[in-house]
Amino acid sequence: MTEATLTPPAVPRLTSLSHGGGCGCKIAPGVLSELLKRATPPALFPDLLVGTESSDDAAVYRLNDEQAIVATTDFFMPIVDDPFDFGRIAATNALSDVYAMGGKPILALALVGMPINVLPHETIAAILRGGESVCAEAGIPVAGGHSIDSVEPIYGLAAIGVVHPSRVKRNAAARAGDVLVLGKPLGVGVLSAALKKNQLDAAGYAQMVATTTKLNRPGAELAALPGVHALTDVTGFGLLGHTLELARGANLTARVHYASLPWLAAVEAFVADGVFTGASGRNWAAYGTDVRLAAGLPPVAQALLTDPQTSGGLLVACAPEAVDDVLACFRADGFDRAAVIGEMVDGPSRVDVA
């Protein structure tokens, strides 16, 4: 028996086992829209406050006059190679949809698909522990789940939350004159592309993990503010895609100020060097006709604005007089990069960036 025979096989990088990663592996918005058009329209349920009609973040079902259930699911393939971090990021991303509806999570179920004969069991266990650690931080149990043997690693959660029916925040309720506030910096997709190309240094990796594992807990408090009209989170369709959902839902124009957008460090330089995800182009192809980019924006603007965010920030549409309270709510929970990025105005359902 040779020495080579005794050498255990190398554990593959998680990102090498998937064709996409994080929210960048979502079905392209144009394809998804076409698929949903072919689905059977759902029956009418009077207590279903939020369903599939407006591309919102989660379903909401009213139990009584005082309480409604928020239900969502989110899972994806690895965006990083560290299994514990992958679990943390996926869980944080899944819980975000509950917060984006103004809800408070109460429990989660794990959704697990793993190539059992490829990954060591300890690697898979570390992914699960990562997700459990985030749920513990959110104060909820992982109360069960489902697992399959799959070709690519997949992990996420089905998350359940509660909200008062009067505090449900939809992505279709913005008003003309509302100010847009973004909770987290942008550029996660770019950094994940750099990681896959072995171009991301330790500092870049640390900032990517820090932002993607920060729970969007201010959502429930924001929903209680009287001046907050609409709420969503920025994920796989990029800032433009999710801002356009606000605009379409309200039949308004969203104006975004490019110079006010917060970016993660080095993302503009990466894009200038051609480092970004394929999802960016798919996003633009799906909704670019409803976006106006002003002349004079930097050449990297389109790729950055369509960059898919994994576990991205909350996007708030609020009355001007509520801006200080919204920013204070973010700051109190450590969202130091939260920023005013634009406003909603009368006009066609589109996004204007200047």
Where are the regions a protein language model picked out?
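N-terminal glycine-rich phosphate/pyrophosphate-binding loops that anchor nucleotide-derived ligands
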Residues: T2-A100, R175-V181, P185, F330-D336, ...
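Glycine-rich anion-binding loops of enzyme active sites
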Residues: L63-V80, D85-R88, K104-L200, G342-E343
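Short pre-catalytic strand/loop immediately N-terminal to key active-site residues, enriched for Gly-Thr
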Residues: F84, G204-T211, H229-A230, V300-L304
